[in-house]
Amino acid sequence: MEMSDYDIVNLASIVEREGLNADQRAHVASVFYNRLAGKLDGLRYLNSDATMMYVTGGEVTADDLQSDSPYNTYKHEGLPPTPICSPSLEALEATLEPSDSDDLYFYITQDEEYFSQTYEEHQQSWN
């Protein structure tokens, strides 16, 4: 996928906030590239909690997901208008060299990580 330097920094800022370590960030970057390529039902939504947390400053509620904010990547396809943080070198490297996966979903906590290709698998991973 062809991206400008600015877009790479923008995506890396989201990868920075979603992953907790280098391996997770490379896998998260892969998921986001798959989503940007339209592999999620032909849509290009990032569906990132991190972009919404940038807007809310904390937890994200169901009401927040209805926001028309350009940072609401559940409602607006593609990248948000600006980076949400200054990404680390690790996040930039992960974005430039993502893992090779077909995954479209992930769930990461301090203790667990789940990556999946279908929404059904995703739901099972955190239920």
What are these language model-derived features?
Residues 1-127:
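Bacterial extracytoplasmic/cell-wall-associated proteins, especially those involved in peptidoglycan
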